[in-house]
Amino acid sequence: METVSLSLWNAPRAEAPVVATVALPGSKSITNRALILAALADGPSTLTGALRSRDTDLMIDALRTLGIGIETAGGDTTLRVAPGPLRGGAVDCGLAGTVMRFLPPVAALAGGTVDFDGDEQARTRPLDTILNALRGLGADIDGDSLPFTVRGAGSLRGGRVTIDASGSSQFVSGLLLSAAAFDEGVTVHHDGTTVPSMPHIDMTVEMLRESGVEVSTPATGGEADTWRVSPGPVRAVDRVIEPDLSNATAFLAAAAVTCGEVTVPLWPAETTQPGDAIREILLAMGADVRRDGANLTVRGPQQLTGIDIDLHDVGELTPTVAALAALADGPSHLRGIAHLRGHETDRLAALAHEINSLGGNVTETEDGLTIVPADLHGGTWRSYADHRMATAGAIVGLRVDGIEIEDIGTTAKTLPGFENLWATMLSASAGTGRKASF
């Protein structure tokens, strides 16, 4: 499994308001869902604008291991997927939650044994919810966390299962994505506190329906907290992948914290991506946010204001929002995100520790963070092998001299070349002749 370098990266301070146009690669969440659906489809399909990152490459490698043909065409971001008989093999999940939670249902359909493992940090991530659910649907599985083994029998009965998905919406999405291939489909009932990151389940449902799969949800008159996928074919669909809006948030934040202006092209008019919520968040913090055709532009205020916000549905934006809050002019309260303690790291503890180590004033609450602005100083910002922790440190570094980020390379999980994109954004800003006033 992969060993990462723990070298330090000097986060550049913005010497001028950040003014740039930043084109982002495709969405990880959409790419990996599209790969699963294409692998189970009734014919070949093409994905255009697919993200190529560690997480998506792990998914591609895993599907190839299981017998799916995946080739590049006209560049790495165009993928041709040819379904085939599923077979056994060894799957490396790395740190990719979408691989370790979306692939086991596929493996249960394979005609052989599939062994799963991942990075050391991944072995603490909760997986028993989806593995126990699969057992209840007829799968033969050894283990409750990485490493574990799925003994595929070539088919899976399916049926009804009750789970507690309050720890991650991926438990629901993972079961739904493959369910049309189960003999009885699947009915997933959630019994627990509110499911986090509901937009990701909406994304899964939308993509299933685009593939001709019949899905019943609470929003369409189905049973409360219950999702039903009927058995049947998955239609092959050629897809154009949207830019990754969650990755875009760090670049838009750069405009917000430097009184600058950043434009992201091809921002979708309608989307299920949680990253779209950054528009309302930045507006609430005093930024100007506007659309011009397919472009989204953020213009930063003279001073960001604090925010009191429930991030339960968009928890992956928490590191970006915490970095913004640490540079605002008043206190912020980030709520509804207790589930982040089970992500790549305990993101709440990590954010509190790293901001406080720079002189900040952050307190963990039962379900979030209270952030009171303070004069920050330079120091080492640990990434915890967490891509969003690394980009949060880069945002803080725009305003604070001497920030050194440990293992910036972890951003390759969802955004390879982040450092170059960041440097290009800042070099474009240097040519504007504007001076920083923060």
From Swiss-Prot:
Cross-referenced SUPFAM superfamilies: EPT/RTPC-like (SSF55205)
Disulfide links within the chain: none
InterPro entries for the chain: Enolpyruvate_Tfrase_dom, Enolpyruvate_Tfrase_sf, EPSP_synthase, EPSP_synthase_CS, RNA3'P_cycl/enolpyr_Trfase_a/b
UniProt-listed Enzyme Commission number(s): 2.5.1.19
Active-site residue list: E316
GO biological process: one example: chorismate biosynthetic process
Transmembrane domains' residue ranges: none
UniProt family annotation: Belongs to the EPSP synthase family.
Name this polypeptide is given: 3-phosphoshikimate 1-carboxyvinyltransferase
Source species: Rhodococcus opacus (strain B4)
